[in-house]
From Swiss-Prot:
GO terms for molecular function: 2 iron, 2 sulfur cluster binding; metal ion binding; oxidoreductase activity. This is Aromatic O-demethylase, reductase subunit. GO terms for biological process: catabolic process. Its EC number is 1.6.2.-. Binds 1 FAD per subunit. It comes from Amycolatopsis sp. (strain ATCC 39116 / 75iv2).
Length: 334
């Protein structure tokens, strides 16, 4: 049965089986979201009227007390009646609608140790913001896996994904690293996620630091390129934390960006396998060494939870404003 759901004065229809988050995003109504698995709590909202089924919302993300008080996770909750909710102050603004996509694989290339670049071609342009992600449907399993977009929004008919092999992973070992080839069809949904730049009229052109761990580099590439397109002379530091030199990729691309934009600097940092050509240690520590004060800077973090948390501490240590800190944790698939 279809129910009407509303937030911030905007109303959409929620079709059978859809979560509140999916209904709002498909209707072009923005709702804070990140993991889409119920683990991060970004999409937590207040149910003002109506009733919802909380689905698979984990207890550690949405406690029994919170459920009793009317809180819900938009990515897990499904309405059981017409429902009105309250979210953040910006919820309800128009955004890029969530879409079902059928893409054609244009290229599959090994670019680093256990890392592949996958290029997907679309018949119709996809409106998105650099830094958002798409969900791929794993053939034959019904499983869905999330991959950040590495390209910019003007490249709207090609989706660039950076994929790291997960031993035993249903998506990587069973598909993306074993059998996926140019010409294959891929089913996906997108765009999703809040990890992107503010609108151009809210972007002050100030200095930025972006820290990515492993393939957490992917969304940062699109964000950095978009930021430089808006303000070509801005200072942008992009740190890539990996285990060893064999895990680095796209060094030529970053050299070209640096040549075009003198304020851009790419800093690889190796944690486990020392190499005299690169810095050792952790990218979050490298930032602390390089930037005496983070006042006026904005910070972007993407990668494993431990790295992201270390980055938040590093930014705060350098007195970066909390409202300028943006993060995207790579969490295990549920």
């Amino acid at each position: 049965m279809t129910f009407a759901v509303s937030v911030g004065g905007r109303r959409v229809d929620c079709e059978p089986g859809q979560t509140l988050l999916e209904a709002f995003l498909r209707g072009g109504v923005w709702m804070p979201n990140s993991c889409n698995q119920g683990t991060c709590g970004t999409c937590k909202l207040q149910v003002l009227s109506g009733e919802v089924d909380h689905g698979g919302a984990p207890e550690d993300t949405l406690s029994a007390e919170e459920r009793a008080s009317g809180l819900a996770l938009a990515c897990q909750a499904r309405p059981l009646a017409d429902t009105e909710v309250r979210s953040t102050a910006d919820a309800g603004r128009v955004t890029h609608p969530l879409r079902d996509l059928t893409a054609t694989v244009l290229e599959v290339a090994d670019i680093a140790r256990d890392t592949r670049r996958v290029l997907l071609g679309l018949a119709e342009p996809l409106a998105f913001e650099a830094g958002q992600y798409v969900e791929l449907v794993v053939p034959g399993s019904g499983a869905r896996r999330q991959y950040s977009l590495a390209n910019t929004a003007d490249e709207d008919k090609v989706l660039e994904l950076h994929v790291r092999r997960v031993p035993g992973g249903v998506a990587t070992d069973g598909w993306l690293f074993d059998g996926l080839a140019a010409g294959d069809r891929v089913e996906a949904t997108g765009p999703l996620g809040d990890f992107h730049l503010p609108p151009p009229d809210e972007d002050d052109g100030g200095p930025m630091v972006l820290i990515g761990g492993g393939t957490g580099l992917a969304p940062l590439v699109g964000i950095a390129r978009t930021a430089l397109a808006r303000h070509p002379s801005r200072e942008v530091l992009l740190y890539h934390g990996v285990r060893g030199a064999a895990d680095l990729y796209d060094l030529g691309r970053f050299a070209e960006i640096a040549e075009e934009h003198p304020g851009f600097r790419f800093v690889p940092v190796l944690s486990d396998e020392p190499d005299p050509a690169y810095r050792g240690g952790f990218p979050t520590d490298a930032f602390v060494e390089d930037v005496p004060s983070g006042r006026g800077w904005s910070g972007w973090l993407c990668g494993p939870p431990a790295m992201v948390e270390a980055g938040v501490k590093a930014f705060k240590r350098r007195r970066m404003s909390p409202r300028r800190i943006h993060r995207e944790k790579f969490t295990p698939a549920s």
